[in-house]
């Protein structure tokens, strides 16, 4: 396997957005008719898959796109206050310097991501940002990107913090690195059998290097 492109999720993988997202979704709970998340419930929710969370919340699947839109707008007001995951900038810089092409695929807005990257001096590390994907539609965007760039499944790897990131990667047969520092717990991620499960950003360097070594 010769990895050429590493695609990253944004929320929870690159940016520490968990607390902000909980506050925002709690604020919108009454409007969209779902239960708020109490602080003591967060650990249990992190053990659920994305689909289980949607089901448990009781929100109508038809309201999800409208909720996502409002969450993005609300997050825009907080984006300047958010921080990168500790150690992620160093890992990204190393991966970029090794000749990898880095990109972002997110259900957040491109504007939010761009503002965040500029604020933290990360914008030059990424070649592309694809935004606006549905909660469970990332695999379609990745497949289209691969086709447009003549990439095969062995040349692309996805990095994400949620069970749905693993599901999307498996649907199109690309390898996935699950990271336990974001939304879903390591136990929830492990149940979905990612190709790699890591717990610190520096481990990204080791995983990608090991894959390149297999080829050489």
Predicted features and spans:
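Conserved Lys-Pro-Asp/Glu-containing loop-to-beta segment of HAD-superfamily phosphomonoesterases
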Residues: 5, 139-166
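Short, acidic loop-to-helix structural element flanking the phosphoryl-transfer center
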Residues: 77-104, 110-114
